[in-house]
Amino acid sequence: MAWRDRRGALRAILTGSACVRPASVYDAISIRIADDLGFPFGMFGGSVASLAILGDPDIALITLTELAEQVRRMSRAAALPVVVDADHGYGNALNVRRTVEELEAAGAAGLTIEDTLLPQAYGEAKPQLVSREEGLGKIKAALDARRDPNLVIIGRTGACSITSLDDAIERALAYQAAGVDALFFTGVKTRAQLEAISAATTLPIALGSPPAELGDFDHLAERRVRIAVQGHAPIAAATEAVFKTLSAIKDGAAPKALTGLASAELMDKVTRADVVAERGEHFLGVKR
């Protein structure tokens, strides 16, 4: 699927009437699994990127180049649209422009730019936000850098849990007026907060890890929520599986005694072994 088609598929979700849950993806294998299972799109979170690329916690240590390369690998591996958490855009508004250019070229279907002050400021234990003016400048720079008009740009704010609901709405309205395609809110905890956000804005809404009170997807859809990110369990599950397998091997378990391993059939499927074999036969004269 061409980049434009993937971006069009994501736009169709935003303009639709349902609230969907994306797959948390972080590498070529995970995005292929998500694609095979029929997820509508993948979400490449910033915390997951830090884990998959560096093995570090989510403290803004990865570089734009590292992020874009991982997106490029995933975009090559599967046709599933990917929304990339581009964090703060890796610097000021001019850095945001470069971020959009690189992620668009890497095949991202969409990306989010947030207003969190990153990296963490000296002496500040709690998350901080950039000013409304700086946040808006970043959004405008992101929109100006977009070459393919189908690339989805989502303005994200963490104000609900850092400053106030009113601040979150004011920031979102500024991003909406600037021309973003959707609004992403983190820290929304109650139906009342969502009602206020939905009433004040007109764009499609995305929520980050909504709590149980916001677990009814029909209710979310009626409030214009089109994306509900359900955390990033897959990489945690993969980490646990590797830990258990290596622990068993260290303790002397024989290969055939190991449990919880992917079958040969599943490995062939996620590595597209049949496609590779067909190409080998066609281009190398290697009989299957």
From Swiss-Prot:
Disulfide partners: none
One Pfam family cited in the UniProt record for this chain: PEP_mutase
This protein's record includes keyword Metal-binding: yes
Protein origin, superkingdom: Bacteria
UniProt-annotated binding residues for Mg(2+): 85
Cofactor detail note: Binds 1 Mg(2+) ion per subunit.
Keyword Zinc-finger appears in the UniProt entry: no
Cofactor(s) essential for the protein: Mg(2+)
Catalytic activity as recorded in UniProt: oxaloacetate + H(+) = pyruvate + CO2
Entry EC no(s): 4.1.1.112
BP GO terms, sorted: oxaloacetate metabolic process; propionate catabolic process, 2-methylcitrate cycle; pyruvate biosynthetic process
Alphabetized UniProt keyword annotations: Decarboxylase, Lyase, Magnesium, Metal-binding
Binding site for substrate: 47, 156, 232
SUBUNIT field: Homotetramer; dimer of dimers.
Function text: Catalyzes the decarboxylation of oxaloacetate into pyruvate. Seems to play a role in maintaining cellular concentrations of bicarbonate and pyruvate.
Membership in a protein family: Belongs to the isocitrate lyase/PEP mutase superfamily. Oxaloacetate decarboxylase family.
UniProt-recorded name of the protein: Oxaloacetate decarboxylase
Organism of this sequence: Rhodopseudomonas palustris (strain ATCC BAA-98 / CGA009)
